[in-house]
Regions:
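A generic "binding-loop/recognition-motif" signal
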Residues: 19, 30, 39-40, 58, ...
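Glycine- and acidic-residue-biased ligand/ion/polar-headgroup-sensing regions
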Residues: 39-52, 56-57
Length: 110
């Protein structure tokens, strides 16, 4: 299922009571909200492009083939550089609505 987002779109390819699988396409120069999860545990894999990841106050640059685990409570944000989109695979526990936004460029609810 494709879902349009203000930063690009996501495709949910696996949704069940055990796990969640998504592909995130982040447009060039866009970023997701600064957020954390109370229960959701996720692992990100970079399929295409370069991802800029802000995790617990530090900035990480992930290239194609890199992966990163984000555990509950870790404040994080994914973004794409100005010159190129990034495509990520996310596999996580199934808590799809477990998002607490700390900061959001698009005015969405925290």
């Amino acid at each position: 299922m494709r879902i349009e987002k203000p930063w690009g779109h996501e495709i949910r390819w696996a949704v069940n009571d055990k796990y969640l699988g998504k592909i995130l396409h982040i447009n060039a120069g866009s970023r997701l909200s600064l957020q954390y999860h109370e229960q959701k545990d996720e692992t990100i894999y970079v399929m295409e492009g370069t991802a800029v990841v802000h995790l617990d106050g530090k900035t990480h640059i992930l290239s194609c083939g890199d992966s990163l685990r984000i555990q509950p409570g870790q404040i994080h944000r994914f973004s794409a550089p100005d010159e190129c989109y990034v495509k990520l695979i996310e596999v996580s526990t199934p808590e799809i609505d477990d998002v607490i936004r700390v900061e959001d460029d698009y005015g969405r609810e925290k």
